[in-house]
Amino acid sequence: MAPVPHRSRHKKGRSGSVRPAHPTVPTWIQYTPEEVEQLAVELARRGFQPSQIGIVLRDQYGIPLVKSITGKKLVKVLEEHGIKYEIPEDLLNLIRRALRIRKHLEEHPKDMSSRRGLQLVESKIHRLIKYYKRVGRLPRDFVYNPQALSHLAT
């Protein structure tokens, strides 16, 4: 069966690295679950986003996956230590991208390919908002309003 391409993505297939279905704790890990949690919390307090924390833990500490060691996902670990993100990181990055495209379109209103790109990004935003409202990560009354969220562009 041939891989089905995702809607509004340039990548056509499913090639790429695949994480193991049942990750086990690698033998070379010398950190306890408590130490991994403390490292993650320290990085979050220094201003790192969850994806950046994962990259730092992987590249500098040799920790491939927080969940395999602690038994909890990284965001759950941070929430337990009082660090909560009001907007999930993937949604926040899409909103920032949409705001950058809007700023570009103010200067270049006839750039139709950017206008189409904005439509694609905003449709992803709306789909994610619907999902996060359904699972309870966003409040039910959350509304995507580019003018109100313009402070997130930085």
Curated annotation (Swiss-Prot):
Domain of life: Archaea
Gene Ontology BP term (one): translation
Keyword Ribosomal protein: yes
Chain segments carrying region Disordered: 1-24
Family: Belongs to the universal ribosomal protein uS15 family.
Subunit structure, interactors included: Part of the 30S ribosomal subunit.
Protein name: Small ribosomal subunit protein uS15
Organism from which the protein derives: Pyrobaculum arsenaticum (strain DSM 13514 / JCM 11321 / PZ6)
Gene: rps15
